[in-house]
A protein has these predicted regions:
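Catalytic micro-motifs at enzyme active sites that drive phosphoryl/nucleotidyl and oxygen chemistry
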Residues: 70-76, 105-123, 157-161
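Long, low-complexity interaction regions most often at the N-terminus
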Residues: 2, 31-33, 112-113, 142-145
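Structural alpha-beta junctions
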Residues: 16, 51-59, 105-115, 151-158
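Helical (often loop-to-helix) elements that flank the catalytic cores of nucleotide-handling enzymes
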Residues: 94-110, 132-158, 180-187
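Short, well-ordered loop/turn elements at secondary-structure boundaries
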Residues: 57-58, 79-81, 112-115, 122-124, ...
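Basic/polar, cationic surfaces and motifs that engage anionic cell-wall
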Residues: 160-187
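DNA replication initiation on ssDNA origins
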Residues: 1-83, 90-101, 168, 176-179
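Histidine-centered divalent-metal-coordination microenvironment in nucleic-acid enzymes
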Residues: 86, 114-139, 169-173, 177
Length: 187
């Protein structure tokens, strides 16, 4: 009976919570949740277990993939690196998301770059996210080198040079992109 209840609970977990649980699996640092609205930009900081209790089905909700020592989203307070990521602004290319994904699957993933753990449709583009074994901020120079390699490799697909920082916030699956009025989804 307990197993059946646990399985039912798993089914009811939102896409957002499942994503957070995977990305921040054993995170000990602070995670930033941000909301961008007509009133401006607001951010809050939570530990992993606090964050999963929140709602994410609203417009323009983002989180950090890496964590911080303090409740400040600044590079000097970076605690753990959990993931590498590339933000593909596909709307700035001559290709559809589907064409880009087909090209990446056929010619890049598993060849020039590893296959990402997550591909997320952010509304106007795609996020490619690679989970890494949690490492301290001392690994930042290596992390940056890999990010820059991914950027150079994926530049023709709309890779955003402005989105290569370890403190970056990305839209969370289950939230709504207000520019396109579409749900951010894991593909």
């Amino acid at each position: 009976m307990v197993l059946a209840l646990k399985q039912e609970d798993e089914k009811e977990l939102s896409q957002s919570v499942k994503y957070i649980n995977i990305v921040h699996r054993n995170s000990e640092g602070w995670i930033t949740k941000a909301k961008i609205s007509a009133e401006g930009y607001k951010q809050w900081h939570y530990k992993h277990m606090q964050l999963v209790k929140l709602k994410f089905d609203k417009d323009n909700v983002c989180i950090t993939l890496n964590t911080f020592y303090k409740t400040y989203r600044r590079i000097e307070y970076l605690r753990e690196l959990n993931a590498l990521f590339i933000d593909l602004d596909t709307y700035k290319t001559d290709f559809t998301k589907e064409q880009i994904l087909m090209n990446l699957n056929e010619n890049y993933f598993g060849k020039n770059i590893p296959t990402p753990n997550f591909i997320i449709d952010s509304g106007r583009g795609l996020y490619l996210i690679w989970l890494i074994k949690k490492v301290p901020s001392m690994a930042l120079p290596l992390w940056k080198a890999v990010e820059e390699y991914f950027y150079r490799t994926l530049k023709e697909f709309g890779a955003d040079i402005q989105a290569l920082d370890a403190t970056r916030i990305l839209r969370i699956p289950g939230s709504i992109n207000s520019k396109t009025h579409t749900e951010v989804k894991i593909i």
